Amino acid sequence: MAPMGIRLSPLGVAVFFLLGLGVLYHLYSGFLAGRFSLFGLGSEPAAGEAEVASDGGTVDLREMLAVAVLAAERGGDEVRRVRESNVLHEKSKGKTREGADDKMTSGDVLSNRKMFYLLKTAFPNVQINTEEHVDASDKEVIVWNRKIPEDILKEIAAPKEVPAESVTVWIDPLDATQEYTEDLRKYVTTMVCVAVNGKPVLGVIHKPFSEYTAWAMVDGGSNVKARSSYNEKTPKIIVSRSHAGMVKQVALQTFGNQTSIIPAGGAGYKVLALLDVPDMTQEKADLYIHVTYIKKWDICAGNAILKALGGHMTTLNGEEISYTGSDGIEGGLLASIRMNHQALVRKLPDLEKSGH
């Protein structure tokens, strides 16, 4: 008896043919995707969207700069609002190494909440270090509209993608808290810095009370520039108010009696003093020197801005500062721009010793 045959209708043939094509397309496209991934190729992400990968993905530094500027300004709004209300809820977190009160206010806390959650919502896969404690129960969802401001697009025309796991963000929600409590408003800043593999690559310093914002990206662009000239022989040196006398003694020995010392609050303010800043409240200096322990969120943004403009910020021994690991540095710091930085380091051999 002859075997029974299987007969398909024309519709069934068409269905099987289409299913076969679908399977082949799926296998072939998966093969191509794997090859493209192997060689680092693939389609470009849509404008304003960072590419996502299984290992945490990448982030666009241009987008991070846009969010950092927004975060610094939003935090600054809180800082200004609290100060103008004159209800600071001031308290001490403990003592600094020099024995002074390490103060905190509502301005610090509310600014920190705005800045941290804006950055964390926009870039959930990056590490964020901030000066103030983040209370998970007090979470605030702030959504970025994914628009990059025109001034940033003008300076940085193309996206700059880096692995998210290589990024560390440093936030200072209120720099110069001591001066803030004394109502010395010109010294107060909010700051955001992005470091890649420990190197500072973009920085934002915002002055809430004059509403001025400086930003810069290394190998990218900036909205601030260096001044046309600096006095290297008898420089004006800006230092912390708490140890101005200590630095003055050594500076006079090093540079002579014509050297002047500018006592000031806030690391952000001191870095801006080295630049061409269109703010009438901003003092001008040629060098920034710090001789005691300092936290990285105080200096990372300024370091990135100086580096982007061709300047330098190192320890007093001339060592580059890494923005990974611990949250502070022991070796003091020297910041300069358009000067022979290493020659200055050699002139200041005793400052670190005198600061401890």
From Swiss-Prot:
Regulation: Strongly inhibited by lithium.
Protein keywords: Acetylation, Glycoprotein, Golgi apparatus, Hydrolase, Magnesium, Membrane, Metal-binding, Signal-anchor, Transmembrane, Transmembrane helix
SUPFAM superfamilies: Carbohydrate phosphatase
Amino acids binding Mg(2+) 2: 172, 175, 298
GO cellular component: cytosol; Golgi apparatus; nuclear body; trans-Golgi network membrane
EC class of the enzyme, as a word: hydrolase
Cofactors that this protein relies on: Mg(2+)
Active site: 108, 177
Binding locations of AMP: 240, 243, 266, 270
PTM text: N-glycosylated. Contains N-linked glycan resistant to endoglycosydase H.
Domain of life: Eukaryota
Spans within the Cytoplasmic topological domain: 1-12
Keyword check for Transmembrane helix: yes
Family: Belongs to the inositol monophosphatase superfamily.
Function, in words: Exhibits 3'-nucleotidase activity toward adenosine 3',5'-bisphosphate (PAP), namely hydrolyzes adenosine 3',5'-bisphosphate into adenosine 5'-monophosphate (AMP) and a phosphate. May play a role in the formation of skeletal elements derived through endochondral ossification, possibly by clearing adenosine 3',5'-bisphosphate produced by Golgi sulfotransferases during glycosaminoglycan sulfation. Has no activity toward 3'-phosphoadenosine 5'-phosphosulfate (PAPS) or inositol phosphate (IP) substrates including I(1)P, I(1,4)P2, I(1,3,4)P3, I(1,4,5)P3 and I(1,3,4,5)P4.
Protein name: Golgi-resident adenosine 3',5'-bisphosphate 3'-phosphatase
Gene: Bpnt2
